[in-house]
Amino acid sequence: MALRMWASSTANALRLSSATRPHYSPLSRCFSSVLDGLKYANSHEWVKHEGSVATVGITDHAQDHLGEVVFVDLPEAGGSVTKATGFGAVESVKATSDVNSPISGEIVEVNSKLSETPGLINSSPYEDGWMIKVKPSNPSELDSLMGAKEYT
C-alpha cells in the first residue's frame, strides 16, 4: 500500500512538473522577439519608418548573440549612411560587430544615451536601444527589407 501511494504521488509530481515547463521545438527559431510594424535586414538590423524619419537599431536576435554590450561606436548626426554599408560597431564581452545600415540617407539624430549606457541595446533593443535616426534618401529601399513574418 505504501509503495502504491509513493508511486502515485511521484507520478503526479512528474505530470505537474512537465506541465509547467514550456515546450520548445527543435525546429523553432531562437529569435527572442520580432515586432510587427518594423522592417528587418538579413544582417539583423531593424527599421521603424515614421513620416520622413526612419529609426534604426539591431534586433533582439543580434543583441542576444552578442551578449552583454559594453561599448557602442556611432557616427555623428549630419553625416550620411549607405544601404548595406557599415555605420557603427557594437562591442560586447564576446565580440565586436559592425552594424550595417539597412537604408541610405542623412543621419538626423544619434542615440547619445548609448555612450553612457550601452546595455540599453540588450535591455530594450527596439525602444531605448535604437541607434540612429535617418531621413531616407531613397524610401523605396524599405520595400526590399523583410516584414516580421519573413524575418522569422
Curated annotation (Swiss-Prot):
Annotated InterPro entries? 2-oxoA_DH_lipoyl-BS, Biotin_lipoyl, GCV_H, GCV_H/Fam206, GCV_H_sub, Single_hybrid_motif
Q: Where is the transit peptide?
A: 1-31
Q: Where is the Lipoyl-binding domain?
A: 53-135
Q: Which Pfam families did the record assign? A: GCV_H
Primary subcellular site in the record, as a coarse category: mitochondrion
Please give the superkingdom of this protein's source: Eukaryota
Disulfide bonds, paired cysteine numbers: none
Q: Which locations, inside or outside the cell, does it occupy? A: Mitochondrion
- Alphabetically list the UniProt keywords: Lipoyl, Mitochondrion, Transit peptide
Q: A GO term (biological process) for this protein?
A: glycine decarboxylation via glycine cleavage system
Textual note on the cofactor: Binds 1 lipoyl cofactor covalently.
Question: Which residues are reported to carry the modification N6-lipoyllysine?
Answer: K94
Q: What does this protein do?
A: The glycine cleavage system catalyzes the degradation of glycine. The H protein shuttles the methylamine group of glycine from the P protein to the T protein.
Tell me the HAMAP family matching this sequence: GcvH
The entry sums up its family as follows: Belongs to the GcvH family.
Q: Which NCBIfam families match?
A: gcvH, PRK01202.1
Assembly state and interactors? The glycine cleavage system is composed of four proteins: P, T, L and H.
Q: What is this protein called?
A: Glycine cleavage system H protein, mitochondrial
Organism (species): Flaveria pubescens (Yellowtops)
